[in-house]
Each structure stands twice: as C-alpha cells, then as structure tokens.
C-alpha cells in the first residue's frame, strides 16, 4: 500500500448453484471509458452523489503517503471537474454519508492521527462546516444511514492501532454521537449493509496486523430498536477488504476480498438470506479482486456492476446467473477507488492506486443503456 498507516453503495434472483456448476464470464454490451482527470491523484477517498447530479470527491491519500484536504466535484453533464472549498482537516479512510436534505456528513479517518472530527458539506454553499465529533477516533469504520436519519458508525481502527468493536449513533440534527452496544469482535475492512426493516448487516473484516491478523467468517446484525448486535450466520470463506450490496429481493451479495496473507484474492461471492439467516454460495467472477469496499453498484435494472480491483469490470446477469466482462476497462487493478452512481444508471469510477502503489487521477464512466 502507499502507506502502512492505512491498512486500515426488475427483481434479482439467483438459482442456488449445484456443487459442480461452472460460472462463466462473457462480454456485456455496456462499456467503460475514461472521461476526465482529477486535479489531485487520490485513493481511499469518498465519492458521493449530490442532489444536483454532481459527484462530490473528498480527501484521500497521496502517492507519497500524505492525506488530502482537497475536494472536487464531477459534473456528469460535460464530464468536467471543479474544485470546491477544502476540508478543515485532511483525511483518508473516512466515511461520507448523504443525508436526505442533500448535505454530506464526512466523519473520522486518518491523517497521521486517528480522527474523531465530523464535517458537513452543504451543496448550496460548496463549503464544509464543523458538525460535532465521534465518541472516539476511528479510521476505516463503516457508516450506515438509518431510516430515522441517524448514522451508525461501526468498528475501524483507533488511537494506537487499536481495533474497535465499538459502535455509535450520530444524529445530524444535533451534531451529537452516542455509544451503542458493541460488536462481538473488533472489525476493520468489514462491510455494513442496510437491510429492509432498518437493520444493518455487518460481514467479515479483520483485526490485527501481519502475522497476528485474524480474518473473520462471522457476521452480525445491528437492531436500531435494541441498539445491540446479534449473530447473523457464517460465511463459507473468511474474508476482508470485500464488498457487499443489497439485491432487489432483499438478499445481500458479498463479493471478493482476501485471506489473512493479503496474497490470495477471491473471485467468489456469497449470498446472505435474511429470511434464513444463512449464507450460500453465489456465482464466481472471472477476476479475483480485493480492497473494493463501496465500489459495487446495483443498476436500475437489478444487475450488479463490480467496478474495481481488476482491470476489467464485470456485470452480474441475474437471469443467467453469471458475470459478464464489461468492454473497455481500467488501466490497472485499482485498489481503494471511489465509485458513485449517476441518475439514469451511469456509474463513475475515480482514483485508487495500482500494484506499484501509484495513485490515479483517472475518472471513468460506465455507460448504462
């Protein structure tokens, strides 16, 4: 990685695969092409769609290991990039959450210190303002907007490289955050997916570093009513640095990731069924990929677009139960890119870094039609 400090969103249905079924990848009609260049190369940043249709790109890490305060807006109407007022505090490995009123809550992260500060972006002024703080500093946490407007922050890494099992609820109306029940284990590089009914599914992740790392196959569910976590089934393969999205039928697709060595990447997927509380094997991708959290998009027609972690993006065709390669692609297997969907179904892929730890200024657009 560029920095050792950061090691630290029609109905879909899948037939349950037979044990000996082979999932193949063919070529989809859609394509990806480069459309713009960022003012600053960045990875471990965030990309958030605004009510105007623009994409807000916040912070991230540089190739030299620094953290960015710079912020850019991508205008999809002409594929242009515009600078906006910077963050008060440079940060990477933070979260950015779009509120119903169009503001964006940027929380936590790292810039040489683990951060607890929160800044809120107002698209009407193009500026950030301070908006309270987390209960404790955290980087690499997950952030999930709940139906009642509060944000659940779970896990991550805190001061002194402490892996966190704690969670907290932040209220944007008051700028205050409060602790809730903790997860069963400390987690970083996990995923958090909002389920129907307002519960949040936490999957996988790890604690520890290098030879002391433990990667989890466990999952748990947070209930806003009880403010506690409970067990929620077990993955067939322990994984971290993966991605997860809710499908149109309410199940959750868990994608890719890696083992504890970070040398074995997965092309496998698993599907969590909230009705049974169990995971089952899903279709496999053509390419193994990891460091992909937040880069998988469910398209308007229910297909699933997996964008980064490999040179070729893939589309999951639900009707045929297979992944299809997307034409065009990326120049490298970008890690920690940031991805957002546009109105009408197009998808924008930004930044990331390659296997040589070079951060990218690239902006690519998947054309949905």
Regions found by a protein language model. Give the residues of each.
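Bacterial N-terminal signal peptides that target proteins for export
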Residues: 1-8
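Bacterial N-terminal signal peptides
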Residues: 8-17
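Kelch-like beta-propeller repeat domains
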Residues: 19-369
């Amino acid at each position: 990685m560029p920095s050792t400090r950061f090691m630290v969103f029609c109905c879909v249905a899948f037939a349950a695969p037979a044990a000996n079924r082979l999932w193949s990848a063919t070529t989809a009609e859609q394509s990806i092409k480069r459309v713009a260049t960022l003012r600053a190369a960045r990875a471990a940043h965030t990309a958030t769609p605004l009510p105007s249709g623009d994409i807000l790109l916040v912070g991230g890490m540089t190739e030299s290991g620094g953290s960015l305060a710079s912020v850019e807006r991508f205008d999809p109407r002409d594929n242009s990039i515009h600078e906006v007022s910077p963050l008060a505090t440079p940060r990477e490995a933070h979260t950015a959450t779009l509120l119903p009123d169009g503001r964006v809550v940027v929380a936590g992260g790292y810039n040489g210190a683990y951060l607890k500060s929160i800044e809120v972006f107002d698209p009407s002024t193009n500026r950030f303002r301070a908006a309270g703080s987390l209960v404790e500093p955290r980087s690499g946490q997950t952030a999930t907007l709940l139906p009642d407007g509060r944000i659940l922050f779970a896990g991550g890494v805190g001061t002194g490289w402490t892996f966190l099992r704690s969670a907290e609820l932040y209220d944007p109306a008051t700028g205050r955050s409060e602790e809730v029940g903790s997860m069963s284990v400390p987690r970083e590089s996990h995923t958090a997916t909002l389920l129907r009914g307002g519960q949040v599914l936490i999957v996988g992740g790890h604690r520890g570093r290098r030879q002391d790392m433990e990667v989890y196959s466990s999952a748990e569910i947070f209930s806003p009513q009880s403010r506690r976590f409970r067990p929620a089934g077990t993955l067939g393969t322990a994984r971290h640095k993966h991605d997860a999205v809710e499908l149109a039928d309410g199940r959750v697709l868990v994608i890719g990731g890696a083992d504890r060595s970070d040398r074995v990447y997965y092309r496998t997927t698993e599907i969590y069924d909230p009705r049974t509380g169990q995971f089952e094997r899903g279709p496999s991708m053509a390419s193994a990929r990891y460091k992909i959290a937040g880069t998988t998009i469910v398209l308007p027609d229910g297909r699933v677009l997996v964008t980064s972690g490999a040179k070729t993006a893939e589309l999951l065709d639900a009707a045929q139960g297979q992944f299809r390669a997307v034409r065009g692609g990326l120049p490298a297997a970008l890690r920690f890119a940031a991805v957002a969907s546009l109105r009408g179904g197009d998808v924008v892929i930004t930044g990331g870094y390659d296997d040589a730890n070079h951060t990218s200024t690239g902006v690519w657009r998947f054309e949905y039609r």
